[in-house]
Amino acid sequence: ITPDSERTMCTFLGTAGKIDDNDIDIQAVKNAEITFMEGYLWDEGGPKKAFDKAILHANKTAMSLSDLFCVDRHKMNFLDLVKNKLDIIFANEQEFTTLIDAKDFKDVVSFSKNLGKTIVITRGEKGSVAIKDSLIYENSINTNLKIVDLTGAGDLFASGFLHGYINNFSIKESLQEGTNMSSKI
């Protein structure tokens, strides 16, 4: 862990990397308000079949792009998911910028406005942004925190946002809920 609370990670999925469509409980997916998927688990073969099956039966879908290396590795597939199959997308600014080959954040906003999806982007010290249809919602960071390790902050952010979203909070309130959760890291 560096002094600014950053870290270097190398994931090993173990048996999770062997998930396939037989592991998807269709009834559980149908019963869920939102089916959340992790970019870390997406891969060709069995995992792709599992994602496709879950997406087919889901009421709403959400996915985290998870990591810049995942975006680089699966760029075309992730772009297809974002454009055509997902309802809510979570990413940090670097991940989303890389996904769409944006020059700057204005390009990200312009691209996202045209999708008709909910794009949620964390921006580090710049806070977070949600873009839904043509509207942009911004939320600042919580201050005066003594963060030691940022591992899991994005996961907590997504869980807080989704908690707000399924409980009919506004997009702005859902961003704040995500910020509050990620601040507990």
Which residues does each PLM region occupy?
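Conserved beta-alpha-beta core of the PfkB/ribokinase-like small-molecule kinase fold
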Residues: I34-V109, K117, K126-S128
